[in-house]
Amino acid sequence: MDHLAHYYHAHIDELNRRVAEIVSREALSGLVIHSGQPHRMFLDDINYPFKANPHFKAWLPVLDNPNCWLVVNGRDKPQLIFYRPVDFWHKVADVPDMFWTEHFDIKLLTKADKVAELLPTDIANWAYLGEHLDVAEVLGFTSRNPDSVMSYLHFHRTTKTEYELECMRRANQIAVQGHQAAKNAFYNGASEFEIQQQYLSAVGQGENEVPYGNIIALNQNAAILHYTALEHQNPARRLSFLIDAGASYFGYASDITRTYAFEKNRFDELITAMNKAQLELIDMMRPGVRYPDLHLATHGKVAQMLLDFDLATGDAQGLVEQGITSAFFPHGLGHMLGLQVHDVGGFAFDERGTHIPAPEAHPFLRCTRILAPNQVLTMEPGLYIIDSLLNELKQNSRGKQINWNSVDELRPFGGIRIEDNVVVHQDRNENMTRELGLA
């Protein structure tokens, strides 16, 4: 924690600098950032799991307490309005007492609807950042999530401070332990549901604490890109395992994927080829490189794999240009990572939010930025046997270039994805996932 405390001081200085610049530019008194409010289930008295506003989490690791507020202007000491009601029904959050508290003036709020008494009196000159625009309107905010402020903050959130990088290393370190436990569970015969339980136990986080719903897919389920069903019964035959799962640390996410074959076979060789390709793509990352160019390079590598494993005929360039590789690799190479799994700013050209669209032939690419130091991105190439996409190839002449017998052999295995979390530095790449022990 000593390292975090040291880095945190500079982190707060940077956030204050950003706020000072944008509020001066927009002639605002400052920003009021709302952690959020509970959401109640329809016709019930139970709330959905609470998720704090990422703009709130950027300042401090208060992740599970609704009705909190930050008042910041970039000049004065940030003010934290911390919700601590008198409540005998629920666990009430303890008064904060961690390394970060010295950087805030903390005021306690006992009743959520009395927050106006603690907010600035000239509230119309402050901008509200948060989800609950109806609450902001009642409180008197006239500027609510202004585009200019949001675009500025989102653009700069892609540049991580040392504090943020350290949090993400720790999120990776935790997730690596979970991945190792899940791998062992797979080879020991566990079901998807059982693998999930062993993963969560290893990371020490519940389903609502990990940053996203884990993908635990055996066999053909690996062909479903966002598979979260978790079957309780084991398949009749154990062939393959794809796990896409992360962990959280102080609000920052890791997002890691591995694929395993149960036996040494052709599918296992394809995993080895994909692993080699993924590492080669990571070696291509450096400041000044356009992320879409890395995505296009991935399609070239997927095309070569289709040829090498007798899944398609022709030449690699032709397979890419005809969209054949997109049927086997339909998603983007990766995305920005940070406070959110699919972090903001991935399409921003500048502080004004000028949008860089994804290439027309690759609409699912989630990042079009030019790489720069201290950005963190996922690198997650894949190859899948997805019947709905391959059936489209069958409907025209492109289907003649597919070796359908080879495709049929791989169909029961579902697919492959390998994903690492990578920091772009000025003179090197830091593959957090690999460097923290996950092969």
From Swiss-Prot:
Q: Does the keyword Oxidoreductase apply?
A: no
> What CDD domains does the database record attribute to this sequence?
Prolidase
For this UniProt record, give its keywords in alphabetical order, as a comma-separated list: Dipeptidase, Hydrolase, Manganese, Metal-binding, Metalloprotease, Protease
Show the catalytic activity: Xaa-L-Pro dipeptide + H2O = an L-alpha-amino acid + L-proline
Q: What cellular-component terms does GO give this entry?
A: cytosol
Domain of life, source organism:
Bacteria
**So where does Mn(2+) 1 get bound?**
D255, H335, E380, E419
Q: Which GO terms describe its molecular function?
A: aminopeptidase activity; metal ion binding; metalloexopeptidase activity; phosphoric triester hydrolase activity; proline dipeptidase activity
The cofactors required by this protein are: Mn(2+)
Which InterPro entries does the entry mention? Creatin/AminoP/Spt16_N, Creatinase/aminopeptidase-like, PepQ_N, Pept_M24, Peptidase_M24B_aminopep-P_CS, X-Pro_dipept-like, X_Pro_dipept
- Gene3D superfamilies attached to this UniProt entry: Creatinase/methionine aminopeptidase superfamily (3.90.230.10), Creatinase/prolidase N-terminal domain (3.40.350.10)
**Assigned EC number:** 3.4.13.9
| PROSITE patterns (alphabetical) | PROLINE_PEPTIDASE
Give the matching Pfam families. Answer: PepQ_N, Peptidase_M24
From its record, what is one biological process in GO terms? Answer: proteolysis
Query: Would the keyword Manganese turn up in this protein's UniProt record?
Result: yes
Please list every transmembrane segment annotated in the UniProt record, as residue ranges: none
The residues that the entry says bind Mn(2+) 2 are D244, D255, E419
Which family is this sequence assigned to? Answer: Belongs to the peptidase M24B family. Bacterial-type prolidase subfamily.
Role according to the record: Splits dipeptides with a prolyl residue in the C-terminal position.
Protein name in the entry: Xaa-Pro dipeptidase
Species of provenance? Shewanella oneidensis (strain ATCC 700550 / JCM 31522 / CIP 106686 / LMG 19005 / NCIMB 14063 / MR-1)
